[in-house]
Amino acid sequence: MQSDNCLDSGSRKVYAAQCYRNPEWRLSTFTSEGSETSLSAKLLTERPAPIVATCLDSWGVLDDAIHHLTPKGSGIWNNVAFVRTTSFVPDWHIVFNSASLFGLPVDIEASPNRTIFAIGEPPTKAHRAFHEGQGKNTIVLTCDAELAARQNAARRFVLSPPITRSWSVNKTYDQLLVSEVVDKPLRLSWITSDIALLKGHRYRLAFLERLRKELDFDLFGRGFRLIGDKWNALAPYRYSIAFENTRADYYFTEKLMDCFVAETMPIYYGSPAITRFFPSDSMVLIDPEDKNVIPKIQEIIDSDLWKERRGAIREAKRLVLEKYNTFAYLAGFIESVQDKPLPPEIIHIDSPEVDFGIDE
């Protein structure tokens, strides 16, 4: 089949509609030695677990995430199976950011209080349309604390960490569970990009330029030195800078969690409340506004702090794998719901867009 990147506008719409009706058209069947085929890659006719959740997404990499983040790439966590299509009515529907990779509106027939909008975008005004969710009596998992605090009769808002890929290094849950990264001959790396669309991007780039003038480190990412697997820019390093584009209590991303799964100590700027989620000894917090921040980083990378705090870093790694792993988190939430499902109805789902006119 022709790559979707080569299709014209009209053909893309037809292809997108076919993908929604038949997601196996665009799914790869992921296998590795000793692993099962991902449940997301086939039409299910029987229940693989007591609870079945059908997934819709605008990620474009959800199936790869299911393969990497669940045991044996199975798509199952505890009592919940995360799938694409079924020949029976699933118990839950989960919408990851929005329902269509191509920005098309989608209608689903689902129980509203068994429909989750799982949002991974930053909690900025530019991204507010994602966090507001859609439908009546649906559930929105959002890291936007201001929005979650509001009383809203239309839908249930639940404050949560962002629902993202969790880690982006090319290692599976099973591989990371047994791996130990002992040999770290290199000092400091930073994986970032030259994207400068929003204020947070530009703030990060300004700090990067300061750092490059005064400190020796290895820089990777789009616009700098491309790398196929982030593991290779983290695992050999004792320290790596993890700099979020948005600063909010519940917002932390793979920038931080990639460090932990590679057992690298993050030098971190981001969530002011990050030590609620991970051990304080597992990272070093920095303030870009501190006039001594660069000498502080130099002192850190010259030290054996990584070795001294290896236990805390490994505990943070465990938390990424078992608690903040997207599918572990969603399974825990789903299993905690006690109310009865509402009757199914048609829920119309549009595709929100980032409002780049709001630069915050």
List each model region and its residues.
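Canonical radical SAM enzyme core domain
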Residues: 122-125
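Pol beta-like nucleotidyltransferase catalytic core
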Residues: 11-119, 130-223, 230-360
